[in-house]
Structures are given as C-alpha cells and as structure tokens.
Amino acid sequence: MTTNLEELGRSPEEQKIFEKIKQRRSQMLVHSCLYYELDTAIVTDDQWQKWADELTQLQKDYPNLCENMGWYDDYFRDWSGATGMHLPHRDPWVLKTARYLMDNQNFTTNTL
C-alpha cells in the first residue's frame, strides 16, 4: 500500500527528512542496545556520535516532523544526543534487531 504524502501533509522533501529521522532514531536505539545491553559494538563511538548529532540537529530543525511521529517519540523528546543509556534497550523490536545485527555483523556493519 502506498501512502499519499499530501494526505499526511508532507512534501516529498519532508518525507525524506522524516525517513532520515526515523533511520537515525533506529540506529540510536539498536546500537545503544548493542552497547549497553549486549556488551558489544559494531560501530565506533565516533560514528554513533555523528549519527546522534545529526539526529539532534534534524529534530531541532524539523520539530513538526517529530511530533507524534510514532517511532519512540517519548524517548527522543528533548534528546540531546549525549547518551543512549536511557533508551528502551529491552523493547522487543530493538532487542531483536540488535541481536540480528550482532549475529550478522560481517554483512551489516554501519548499515542500521
């Protein structure tokens, strides 16, 4: 099923930004789970921080796209990007995705 962007009130450019915010949130969730819950890392601290800084800036620049986004909104509201310690590492989707990446890291490094 395709989504009509006009129905969502988003331009194609806004949709790209929305998807980038969702991607960066996903990366913060999964890689924080790997680090804090599973005691491993498949990206460097510098790479994680680069993604965190980009997400912080995107959320600052486009707050209208982050309101009621439906992707872990409460955890990223007023998020500074300083740490992922408070994120929901034991959330079923987060944990499953982190374990998948850990098990397949030779094929997926730096992707999610």
Predicted regions and their residues:
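Phosphate/adenylate-binding "loop-and-lid" substructures adjacent to NTP/NAD/dNTP-binding pockets
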Residues: 1-112
